[in-house]
Curated annotation (Swiss-Prot):
Protein name per its UniProtKB record: Probable methionine--tRNA ligase, mitochondrial
Nucleotide-binding found in the keyword field: yes
Leading EC class: ligase
Compositionally biased region (Low complexity): 610-622
Key words, A-Z: Aminoacyl-tRNA synthetase, ATP-binding, Ligase, Mitochondrion, Nucleotide-binding, Protein biosynthesis
Localization per Swiss-Prot or TrEMBL: Mitochondrion matrix
Main subcellular location of this protein, as a coarse class: mitochondrion
CDD domains, alphabetized: MetRS_core
Length: 622
């Protein structure tokens, strides 16, 4: 863990040195006016919000976040999905030549963590150190290119939270009162009675009250604590949602948020008595109260961007406002109601977009340790490979609807798209001795090949294919701008399928046997090679290692692997492999073709057999 934290510190230092995260020491009360706009210049609570977010200056980095993950349990495949989604979005911007930053990390305070530490007979901080390291290991294992691994126990974050609290208090938005209600430890929040139902444990017969939304048990709590006047911001929130209907992806979740704010918005309890929750950030000026974990956690996003040390109007240097928050659908309310309300209260810019993804299930059931159907991402990557898992997560993962995880289906997808798709096409283009990709590229460069319609079927098929290639990068970019990486990846793989069909129909292995066939064969191989080269460039954010191997196999120079080069006939230097990959190629056959294991050891050599997928399990809902 020390090595990982050192790497994180180096990344943070790099941004500081570049002027991106300009930090000073803690801002005292007497100096705060230097960093916070005067009251006269601040918006009042009644001021309307009519734009999505301010137009950021050109030097603002594209800022992506994943959720910060609770350390009360080990990482699972759902955590990996959030991380990979965020990583793909960041890498896409980097591919386009834009400055981009990614923040991930761990949420280390709260009742859940406190109870888990006690259950493990550990000091809370030691417990957090141990489990936070597991998430750092996951990020490293699945090649997450983060710029900071945030921990809510980090001192700069603790200071940011206290500063935020004091400003809310200064504006009269915090008051103390008795609070009573149904509290869910698992979800770390109170629920109104309208959001509760009675349930019965199928094993013990116990009847209990649970959240309709999450299904987790709630308990009745009566205590005195601090509240945030969130209802004072109701009109501003609703106006913001109205003016920014595409703020949340998918659209259906925006409807849920608007309905909640319209019908259920209450002032928010934002502290807990130390007698009940001692593990957390203490309320400034009141050591008897601990700041509510979700207020603490949400502020991590602006801590990363340098808050509270922003000279007026310069928050963009640290990346704020965030361009995309990647979250799971289970934390929608916190990010789309509580968070914008807190930001509006302090006149801070709101996030530009929220990508709220669905969950991974097993045989249409929620993954649960008690059932034994939780997929361990480390074992899965060991079995299938890092980039195969990244591919499967994005290609088959759900945004609007849950996706069903299946080792059987993962193997099917691997064979179809990677082994028989990319692998087969790369072998067809680069291996045969009857033709040469380099010769084909050079022939076009020398002006010996004119790609224009002649009325001859194979030649015209080449021209049509090249024309489609010319539109691909912009099509994929549009999908990414719409926060739909799954569709983007599916369209790239569609190109691979089309190119395999093209080369099968053209049959260069037949044509090459004919006299004076070299020019036509070169035309076919160049067309297929261009498809592979462009696909390899566009696949880099999704499968960084395998895409690099593909481009090495094609002999594409590093400086020619940018989004600008994802157009046909712009690289005249490739065609001679930098390295080869043996008989099995880039995508060898799966370790086991008959994998049936569905449990927590999925992908592990230790795993034998588990539950079979349901007979109706075809393709996960995307």
């Amino acid at each position: 863990m020390d090595v990982l934290r050192t790497a994180s510190a180096r990344r943070t230092f790099k941004w500081q040195a570049a002027g991106i995260l300009a930090r000073t020491s803690w801002v005292c009360r007497s100096c705060r006016s230097q960093f916070v706009a005067p009251k006269a210049a601040r918006r009042t609570l009644a001021t309307s919000t009519t734009t999505t977010t301010p137009t950021a200056p050109d030097n603002k980095p594209f800022y992506v976040t994943t959720p910060i993950f609770y350390v009360n349990a080990s990482p699972h495949v759902g955590h990996m999905y959030s991380m990979v989604l965020g990583d793909v979005l960041k890498r896409w911007q980097t591919l386009k030549g834009n400055q981009a930053i990614l923040c991930t990390g761990t949420d280390e305070h709260g009742t859940k963590v406190q109870r888990a530490a006690i259950a493990n007979d550990m000091d809370p901080k030691q417990f957090c150190d141990l489990n936070s390291a597991k998430f750092q290991e996951l990020a490293a294992a699945c090649r997450i290119d983060y710029d900071r691994f945030m921990r809510t126990t980090d001192q700069d974050h603790v200071e940011a939270v206290k500063h935020f609290w004091l400003l809310l208090k200064e504006k009269g938005l915090i008051y103390e009162a008795k609070h009573e209600g149904w509290y869910c430890v698992s979800d770390e929040c109170f629920y109104p009675e309208s959001q509760l139902e009675k349930r019965q444990d199928p094993f013990t017969g116990e009847v209990y009250v649970a959240s309709i939304e999450s299904g987790n048990k709630v308990e009745w709590i009566e205590e005195k604590n601090y509240h945030f006047r969130m209802t004072a911001l109701k009109d501003q929130l609703l106006e913001f949602y109205k003016n920014n209907p595409d703020w949340i992806v998918p659209q259906t979740r925006m409807n849920q948020v608007v309905d909640w704010v319209t019908n259920n918005l209450e002032d928010l309890s934002i502290s807990r008595p130390v007698s009940r929750l001692s593990w957390g950030i203490r309320v400034p000026d009141d050591e008897s109260q601990t700041i509510y974990v979700w207020v603490d956690a949400l502020i991590n996003y602006i801590t990363m961007a340098g808050y509270p040390y922003w000279p007026p109007g310069r928050e963009h240097l640290g990346g704020w406002p965030v361009d995309v928050h990647v979250i799971g659908k289970d934390i929608l309310r916190f990010h789309c109601i509580y968070w914008p309300a807190l930001l509006l209260a302090l006149d801070l810019p709101l996030p530009k977009r929220i990508l709220s993804h669905a969950h991974w299930t097993m045989e249409k059931k929620k993954m649960s340790k008690s059932i034994g159907n939780v997929v361990n991402p480390f074992y899965a990557m060991e079995r299938f490979g890092i980039d195969t898992m990244r591919f499967y997560m994005i290609h088959n993962g759900g945004i609007a609807n849950d996706a069903d995880y299946s080792n059987d289906w993962l193997t099917v997808e691997y064979k179809k798209h990677l082994q028989n798709g990319v692998g087969n096409l790369s072998a067809r283009v680069t291996r045969p001795k009857q033709w040469s990709l380099r010769r084909a590229v050079q022939s076009y460069q020398d002006g010996n090949m004119l790609l224009q319609s002649t009325g001859e079927q194979i030649n015209d098929s080449c021209v049509e294919h090249i024309t489609r290639l010319d539109k691909l990068a912009s099509t994929i970019d549009n999908e990414m701008l719409q926060l739909n990486p799954s569709h983007a990846l599916q369209k790239i793989m569609g190109l691979i399928g089309e190119t395999n069909a093209f080369i099968s129909n053209a049959e260069p292995w037949v044509i090459v046997k004919k006299q004076d066939s070299e020019a036509l064969v070169d035309r076919i191989i160049l067309t297929a090679g261009e498809s592979l080269r462009i696909a390899g460039i566009l696949l880099q954010p999704f499968m960084p290692d395998k895409a690099a191997q593909l481009l090495d196999l094609l002999g594409v120079e590093n400086h020619n692997r940018t989004f600008h080069h994802a157009r046909p006939l712009v690289d005249a230097t490739y065609g001679t492999a930098f390295r080869t990959f043996g008989k099995e190629g880039i995508f060898p056959p799966p370790i086991l073709d008959d994998i049936k294991g569905m449990g927590p050891d999925a992908g592990s050599k230790k795993h034998s057999s588990g539950n079979k997928p349901s007979s109706g399990n075809k393709k996960p809902t995307a």
